[in-house]
Amino acid sequence: QLTLALIKPDAVAHPLILEAVHQQILSNKFLIVRMRELLWKPEDCRRFYREHEGRFFYQRLVEFMTSGPIRAYILAHKDAIQLWRTLMGPTRVFRARHIAPDSIRGSLGLTDTRNTTHGSDSVVSASREIAAFFPDFSEQRWYEEEEPQLRCGPVHYSPEEGIHCAAETGGPKPA
């Protein structure tokens, strides 16, 4: 299963926090299918969070998410969506600190907006969100061409590219 994971500006701004989150991804055996860092344009951010438009936190969220670089990942794992959400912990940092203190948000989150990470909440959301950040990525092509190679191994993690690839290919196929 694929999911989108975002590392928010509060974490990207601090190299040690960014590296800690990245290591959590690796140590939990996620395959990093794609990764990119970007400065989010306000109009793209508003479109992404349009379901929250009109809510009290919407403008603050858009301003924060466009305030600095973010890192976007496509992660693969059995039950990737649920596993990533469990690793992140509850959205509300106060709750995360009490219910899941070892989660990413419980240990690194600052506020409910500056809570370090975002993750897709369903298969439908994951597809939509992946397309928003990786418009040239084809899920269908990935499942047909790359996923079987990654599943059957051997798999290599390339620190230079920040992604996993089948050992014999040396990198992802162009989208």
Curated annotation (Swiss-Prot):
ATP binds at residues 8, 57, 85, 91, 105, 115. It catalyses: a 2'-deoxyribonucleoside 5'-diphosphate + ATP = a 2'-deoxyribonucleoside 5'-triphosphate + ADP; a ribonucleoside 5'-diphosphate + ATP = a ribonucleoside 5'-triphosphate + ADP. GO terms for biological process: CTP biosynthetic process; GTP biosynthetic process; negative regulation of cell growth; negative regulation of mitotic nuclear division; UTP biosynthetic process. It comes from the Eukaryota. Its EC number is 2.7.4.6. The keyword Nucleotide-binding applies. Coiled coil: none annotated. Its cofactor is Mg(2+). Keywords: ATP-binding, Kinase, Magnesium, Metal-binding, Nucleotide metabolism, Nucleotide-binding, Transferase. The keyword Oxidoreductase does not apply. Belongs to the NDK family. Major role in the synthesis of nucleoside triphosphates other than ATP. The ATP gamma phosphate is transferred to the NDP beta phosphate via a ping-pong mechanism, using a phosphorylated active-site intermediate. This is Nucleoside diphosphate kinase 6. It comes from Rattus norvegicus.
